[in-house]
């Protein structure tokens, strides 16, 4: 199982004949068994938390005395107000829902079980008393009768903080949540440390709420633009590079110009007739416009410099995009692969979060310093948290690796099928079938290696965040260096893993053998890898920039109409981030296809020479691309010792549509 092999095995590997798609065998079975055992452990954690009553406490909620709302409870020893009958009290109500513990990120307000949530704001204790008499829902402590709300001297402690915000029950979780956004703004202050002025945060969140329809529309626009770009890649890949280049130039110039124009316009606008609140909003918008304009200018200059350096290599990318476009023509379901992966990730994340919430309410009841009940796990079971966190990383990486193996298997099937008319009816489903039958162990091993690197990096990032504001600058610098090194190692391993999955899809070898073979082939074709990855990835990056710029420009024009009464700094950031994520999800599949095609090509040229019986599998356009790339690099004096072998044309029947 080790990745290290003897010299004899290495020699045998170098002499081994590659037989694409011919021999299929199970790979890395012990790692599949280990992964299955790990998943059984994850299931045990979920089952344990449900069996110990955590599910009822999570869904129905419980008060500060350990009573579950909506049912009869048993008496807890030495705990006052425990063992109460809450059959008619089905909702959890917090006396002060905005009172947050900023250290432990949890509400430290007293929680009670009530019959109904106050749908309207209650400004006085008389209103609270009237609400209890009309609705039969007592909002003060169990020890205080409704008739004593306005007369008892303990009302200020045992009753909710005034004014009581209007609230509504959270669906399925029976908690009374304030409907006023100001409480959530205060909660966000615990997470957003860079905001020191409460009013700024309130204005930002109000800007998001005011512009929510525009934000939703712009997010849909980014999705439509991404799908349109994928269609363009499929059908007009030959002119796509030039279209992207021109549009990015126009988009970056236009966006930068509009930002400076809006900044100058708003700076000259009269401010004598506006209210103080509108003046503050205008100043926030003016400051944001200046930051955006300067950032856009710097980005545009850097982008132009990069395009100036790479202008001679742009033409070489056209052929590569053309071949990759053919793959999407024959395998149209590849476009939807990110949706299935995202759907699987969302399902797992929902399960993981639900189990995490179960764990947060499981354990034995313990009385804290304030006399209230907390549930804590003691003994070895308290380490289930760590097991659960490792499961989040490993299984998430496993799902992403399954996508890589599925895409690699489908593209490998396309590349090594000489007559494209003989392709399987659904190459994607055929690839999924091979993955499930043969290669789940390889995917489990590759994702585990990424997990081994990601966990230490996350631990170091947490330690680094805890050292912020401390005087030990040397320790922070060392930690930052270690984090950067682990990040680089993780990216390199991700790239190597992807190529290892491709080698496994081609020749059905285990992970270590595939990784070694892929690494050797990539090293032998280092110059070609540099050319293809640099130019191809840069053009895909331009596609992402185009989508973000287009969505951001539309957002600027739409949100500009609301500049007098809302701050659109945060809405614009949300829209641009979502646009980038959507574009990345779509174009990452295209990038993956390009990488798989290149490794297939490198293996093809290494083990075939065009002679009878050893004909090339590759597309003629791909051969022309690499040959032109090699000539261009030789002319630039960067080719080194180039391969002098002439690329021979494909055998009959190898051409693709």
Curated annotation (Swiss-Prot):
Tissue expression notes: Expressed in various cells of the hematopoietic system.
Region span, Disordered: 635-657
Domain of life from the UniProt record: Eukaryota
One Gene Ontology molecular-function label: choline transmembrane transporter activity
Lipid-modified residues, N-myristoyl glycine kind: 2
Entry keywords, A to Z: Antiport, Cell membrane, Lipoprotein, Membrane, Mitochondrion, Mitochondrion outer membrane, Myristate, Neurodegeneration, Phosphoprotein, Transmembrane, Transmembrane helix, Transport
Catalysed conversion reaction: choline(out) + n H(+)(in) = choline(in) + n H(+)(out); ethanolamine(out) + n H(+)(in) = ethanolamine(in) + n H(+)(out)
Bias (Basic and acidic residues): 635-648
InterPro entries found in the cross-reference section: Choline_transptr-like (IPR007603)
GO BP annotation list: choline catabolic process; choline transport; ethanolamine transport; phosphatidylcholine biosynthetic process; transmembrane transport; transport across blood-brain barrier
CC per GO annotation: cytosol; extracellular exosome; membrane; mitochondrial outer membrane; mitochondrion; nucleoplasm; plasma membrane
Membrane topology qualifier: Multi-pass membrane protein
One Pfam family from the record: Choline_transpo
Residues on Mitochondrial intermembrane side: 52-212, 260-288, 337-338, 402-537, 588-653
Stretches in topological domain Cytoplasmic: 2-30, 234-238, 310-315, 360-380, 559-566
Disease in which the protein is involved: Neurodegeneration, childhood-onset, with ataxia, tremor, optic atrophy, and cognitive decline: An autosomal recessive neurodegenerative disease characterized by progressive ataxia, tremor, cognitive decline, dysphagia, optic atrophy, dysarthria, as well as urinary and bowel incontinence. Brain MRI demonstrates cerebellar atrophy and leukoencephalopathy.
Family the UniProt entry places it in: Belongs to the CTL (choline transporter-like) family.
Name of the featured protein: Choline transporter-like protein 1
Organism of origin: Homo sapiens (Human)
Lineage of the species this protein comes from: Eukaryota, Metazoa, Chordata, Craniata, Vertebrata
Gene: SLC44A1
């Amino acid at each position: 199982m080790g990745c290290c092999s003897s010299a004899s095995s290495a020699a045998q590997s170098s002499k081994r004949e590659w037989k694409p798609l011919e021999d299929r065998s199970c790979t890395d079975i012990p790692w599949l068994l280990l992964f299955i055992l790990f998943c059984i452990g994850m299931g045990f954690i979920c089952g344990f938390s449900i069996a110990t009553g955590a599910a009822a406490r999570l869904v129905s909620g419980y008060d500060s005395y350990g009573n579950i709302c909506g049912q009869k409870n048993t008496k807890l020893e030495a705990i006052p107000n425990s063992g109460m009958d809450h059959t008619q009290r089905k909702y959890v109500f917090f006396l002060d829902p905005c009172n947050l513990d900023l250290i432990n990120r949890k509400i430290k307000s007293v929680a009670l079980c009530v019959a109904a949530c106050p749908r309207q704001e209650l400004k006085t204790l008389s209103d609270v008393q009237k609400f209890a008499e009309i609705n039969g829902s007592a909002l003060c402590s169990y020890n205080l009768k409704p008739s004593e709300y306005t007369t008892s001297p303990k009302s200020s402690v045992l009753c909710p903080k005034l004014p009581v915000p209007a609230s509504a029950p959270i669906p399925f979780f029976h908690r009374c949540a304030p409907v006023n956004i100001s409480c959530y703004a205060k909660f966000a202050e615990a997470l957003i440390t860079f905001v020191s002025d409460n009013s700024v945060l309130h204005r930002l969140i109000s800007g998001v709420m005011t512009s929510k329809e525009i934000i939703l529309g712009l997010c849909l626009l980014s999705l439509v633009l991404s799908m349109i770009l994928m269609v363009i890649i499929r059908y007009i890949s030959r002119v796509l590079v030039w279209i992207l280049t021109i549009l990015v130039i126009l988009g970056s110039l236009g966006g930068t110009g509009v930002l400076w124009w809006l900044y100058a316009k708003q700076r000259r606008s009269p401010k004598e007739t506006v209210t103080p609140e509108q003046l503050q909003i205008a100043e926030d918008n003016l400051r944001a416009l200046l930051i955006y304009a300067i950032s856009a200018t710097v980005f545009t200059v850097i982008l132009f410099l990069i395009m100036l350096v790479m202008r001679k290599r742009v033409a070489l990318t056209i052929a590569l995009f053309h071949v990759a476009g053919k793959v999407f023509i024959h395998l149209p379901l590849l476009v939807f692969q990110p949706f299935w992966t995202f759907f699987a990730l969302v399902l797992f994340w929902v399960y993981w979060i639900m189990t995490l919430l179960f764990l947060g309410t499981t354990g034995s009841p313990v009385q804290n310093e304030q006399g209230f009940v907390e549930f804590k796990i003691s003994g070895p079971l308290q380490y289930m948290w760590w097991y659960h966190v490792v499961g989040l990383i490993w299984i998430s990486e496993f799902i992403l690796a399954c996508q890589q193996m599925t895409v690699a298997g489908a593209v490998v099937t396309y590349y090594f099928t000489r007559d494209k008319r003989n392709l399987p009816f659904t190459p994607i489903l055929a690839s999924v079938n091979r993955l499930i039958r043969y290669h789940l162990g390889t995917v489990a091993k590759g994702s585990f290696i990424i997990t081994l690197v990601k966990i230490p990096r996350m631990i170091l990032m947490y330690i680094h965040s805890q050292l912020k504001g401390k005087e030990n600058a040397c320790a922070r610098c060392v930690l930052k260096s270690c984090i950067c090194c682990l990040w680089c190692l993780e990216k390199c391993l991700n790239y190597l893993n992807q190529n290892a999955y491709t080698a496994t899809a081609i020749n059905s070898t285990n992970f270590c053998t595939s990784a070694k073979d892929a690494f050797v082939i990539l090293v032998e074709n280092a110059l070609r890898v540099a050319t293809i990855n640099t130019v191809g990835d840069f053009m895909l990056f331009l596609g992402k920039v185009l989508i973000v710029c287009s969505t951001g420009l539309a957002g600027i024009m739409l949100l500009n109409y609301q500049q007098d009464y809302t701050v659109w700094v945060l809405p614009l950031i949300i829209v641009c981030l979502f646009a980038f994520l959507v574009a990345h999800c779509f174009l990452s599949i295209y990038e993956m296809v390009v990488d798989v095609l290149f490794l297939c090509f490198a293996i093809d040229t290494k083990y075939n020479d065009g002679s009878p019986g050893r004909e090339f599998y590759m597309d003629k356009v791909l051969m022309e691309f690499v040959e032109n790339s090699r000539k261009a690099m030789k002319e630039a004096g960067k080719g080194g010792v180039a391969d002098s072998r002439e690329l021979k044309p494909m055998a009959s029947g190898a051409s693709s549509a």
